[in-house]
Design a protein with these regions (language model features):
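Long, histidine/aromatic-enriched segments associated with O2/redox biology
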Residues: 1-190
Length: 190
């Protein structure tokens, strides 16, 4: 994707050639997705079905790539994760054992994966998601599709992504110092 869109407005040069997504990281690690069984409605008139959510997000990549690799890794995963560790991830990225509130107080920020780990059910993600890079609106963006048993699962996951349960750091809110939220803006939802 990067090679196809080199030079596109808002798509900076430092994106690694082998990066599957514009932000430079892999999305589909083993065990970081809900299973089909996890997202299937078990009973009732919609048994065997699921619910779907689709968002279109604009990405602010210029300022993202002004961050050091260390800072990008910290924001994607957790402040305690190093670039060397992140490069070796093939399975679900482990969330630090430290509680989210403690990380926020200690580092003044939390990581995207770390925040999402707080909403798992029996240790597994609640949504089955797909992220697809796009330039359809003239700049870098992302189509985000999720399947979940109930829209409540999407809402809980979205609240976790906003670190809704942690306000331990004065500079942490739903966007600032909160994973990758500062570099994404929802333009459409359905």
């Amino acid at each position: 994707a990067r090679a196809q869109h080199a030079g596109l407005a808002g798509t900076p040069r430092p994106i690694a050639r082998d990066a599957p997504l514009f932000m430079g990281f892999k999305s589909g690690l083993r065990r970081n997705q809900a299973t089909e069984e996890d997202v299937t409605i078990p009973s009732g008139p919609l048994a065997g079905g699921t619910t779907l959510h689709l968002s279109t997000l604009a990405l602010e990549l210029d300022s993202w790539y002004e961050l050091s690799e260390r800072d990008r890794v910290a924001r994607m995963y957790a402040p305690q994760v190093t670039p060397a560790q992140a490069a070796r991830f093939t399975d679900d990225a482990p969330a630090p054992a430290e509680r989210l509130e403690r990380t926020a107080a200690r580092y003044g920020r939390v990581g995207h994966v770390q925040a999402l780990a707080t909403v798992r059910r029996d240790g597994r993600p609640r949504i089955l998601r797909r992220d697809v890079n796009t330039v359809d609106d003239g700049g870098p963006g992302l189509y985000f599709l999720s399947l979940q048993r109930s829209i409540d699962d999407f809402v809980a996951t979205r609240q976790a992504m906003s670190a809704a349960r942690s306000r331990a750091a004065p500079g942490l809110d739903g966007v600032l110092n909160n994973g990758i939220n500062e570099w994404m803006r929802v333009t459409r939802r359905g």
